[in-house]
């Protein structure tokens, strides 16, 4: 869900565990430095997927070549030098749950919240009307849902695709951070 405090939560977890936080901008900048941005520009920029192209692609075989894109597009992250005492990365979005699935050194988290929470956050953060905020939240969520399905074949936000799914509206930012911390400390 759009505007569910992912930046704030991701940065706090990164700081606590001495990790670099990588959002869309940081991933794109690092991909440019690594020389792989041009090959996966649409993936890095999270451009809305063309609905006609999406329909054609989804009608083809299940193991679509596009489903390899997140893994290929994010491989450079494992080769980035770790600086400032950091021990790894918190990656926001970019189908990272899919790209890094099955790894013991990865925890994938999906943050959710009800529409009212997201709309209020957008309206407050960007100083727009509730009506405009509703449109922005709906369109952004629809684009992300389509983007995730297009590149992974998975439903965005489905619990089985993540280690943790947490509701920011119910837990608050501090509660979500505490739950992530507890999961990391107690996982086997």
At which residue positions do the language-model features occur?
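Conserved phosphate-donor/acceptor-positioning beta-strand/loop module used by diverse small-molecule
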Residues: 102-140
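Small-molecule kinase domains that catalyze NTP-dependent phosphoryl transfer to phosphate-bearing small molecules
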Residues: 49-56, 67, 130-174
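Short beta-strand-centered segment that lines the nucleotide-binding/catalytic pocket of NTP-utilizing
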Residues: 19-32
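Long, contiguous binding/interaction regions
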Residues: 94, 98, 102, 110-116, ...
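RNA pseudouridine synthases
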Residues: 80, 84, 89, 93-102
